[in-house]
């Protein structure tokens, strides 16, 4: 199964099974597309979790200030989109298990990208805490179930990436 090891310089080595590669590729690909989408054209639920439009209004940030804030966040996401393009090139091919290497300086962006995918999928299905329990996943069907599987898998992957290495 999935293993993540931390190297001496902070880089990570992953050992993936074929289905894990497929899931990660799918998550990165769809997140890259969403990153390239102008914030105003995103599903409003997604726009709100990624760009906090509602939150900005609540704290009185409006008009041009709000636009600059959202633009800044979008720029950061476009930067991650470029990184994700590189990750997809170096991941094992679809349908294959294999090892993968992530540089130390990209760990934070990788985790942020996976988290964005989780937030987006939860927003698309308007999932709350209760929906994220494993029992709820077992009962759900179709696209919602796929979203829940992705959310849980990526949470686990993030945990493995961030865990303190036991010496």
Label the model's feature ranges.
Residues 33-42, 118-131:
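Extended intrinsically disordered, low-complexity coil regions enriched in Ser, Thr, Gly, Ala
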Residues 83-102, 132-141:
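Short, charged/polar, low-complexity loop and linker segments
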Residues 34-62, 68-78, 82, 86, ...:
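Basic, glycine/lysine-rich polyanion-binding surfaces/domains
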Residues 8-11, 15-18, 63-75, 98-108, ...:
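Short, solvent-exposed segments of well-ordered alpha helices
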Residues 143-167:
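Helix-rich interaction surfaces within compact, conserved domain-sized segments
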């Amino acid at each position: 199964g999935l293993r993540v090891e931390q190297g001496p310089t902070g880089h990570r080595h992953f050992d993936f099974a074929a289905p894990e590669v497929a899931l990660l590729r799918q998550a990165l690909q769809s997140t890259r597309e969403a990153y390239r989408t102008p914030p105003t054209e995103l599903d409003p639920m997604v726009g709100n979790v990624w760009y906090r439009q509602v939150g900005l209004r609540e704290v009185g940030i409006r008009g041009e200030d709000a636009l600059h804030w959202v633009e800044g966040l979008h720029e950061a996401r476009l930067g991650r989109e470029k990184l994700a393009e590189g990750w997809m090139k170096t991941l094992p091919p679809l349908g294959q298990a294999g090892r993968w290497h992530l540089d130390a300086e990209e760990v934070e962006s990788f985790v942020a990208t996976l988290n964005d995918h989780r937030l987006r999928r939860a927003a698309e299905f308007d999932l709350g805490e209760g929906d994220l329990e494993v029992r709820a996943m077992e009962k759900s069907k179709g696209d919602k179930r796929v979203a829940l599987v992705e959310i849980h898998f990526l949470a686990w992957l993030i945990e493995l990436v961030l865990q303190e290495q036991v010496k």
